[in-house]
Amino acid sequence: MGKLTGKTALITGALQGIGEGIARTFARHGANLILLDISPEIEKLADELCGRGHRCTAVVADVRDPASVAAAIKRAKEKEGRIDILVNNAGVCRLGSFLDMSDDDRDFHIDINIKGVWNVTKAVLPEMIARKDGRIVMMSSVTGDMVADPGETAYALTKAAIVGLTKSLAVEYAQSGIRVNAICPGYVRTPMAESIARQSNPEDPESVLTEMAKAIPLRRLADPLEVGELAAFLASDESSYLTGTQNVIDGGSTLPETVSVGI
């Protein structure tokens, strides 16, 4: 029996990257899955996992739209009954300097990375409170709260906000049996990382990923499945005394000094 057997998990942004990695990992640990994404392609991932013997429901929704979220969750609960675990993973990143970034691009980050998390959490939380049991995993980043890079001001702003939201919700709903924890990944080999690499160097994006890896003490980018294992831990009873925490998974990328004077 897996650590998540008998639990139903809603994962947003589940189609690809970290979200897909979490979905596959949760399935392996026995969870029933509700996979939410803005793309109808999410049905294919759900069909694949169902074909492998996992219980899985796909719902299409735009996390920016509370009505869309509410309708999707209603459909999912009609099939799955309840939601024990929420993984707020849906997120975006577009590079652009602070002065050059348009208001539309700024709001794009805020609407998905902050308001989207707010909307989904607000839709799921009341049921968890009524049962006095729930686990919420927030996808933040090392970018924003711990480190920063040029061109990622909007992204850093929103991911730092998720840390604050995590801690606030953890305090506010601890006595309701709700645990809320954040994951702060470093570089993960995902379509988002590949998109950042293309924006940085359209002619040779792979070289950007190679340089990223060289700057990491473990000398590689994370696999989404590794982030999935951390999420599974936070969603399981193994982390029963953890709430309001920031869990860094970055291969040591935030450890080195900018300029080393060591050996």
Swiss-Prot record:
InterPro entries to which the protein is assigned, alphabetical: NAD(P)-bd_dom_sf (IPR036291), SDR_fam (IPR002347)
Active site residues per record: 155
Keyword Oxidoreductase: yes
Signal peptide: none
Residues binding substrate: 141
The UniProt record lists the keyword Cytoplasm: no
Record EC number: 1.-.-.-
Family membership: Belongs to the short-chain dehydrogenases/reductases (SDR) family.
Protein name according to UniProt: Oxidoreductase UcpA
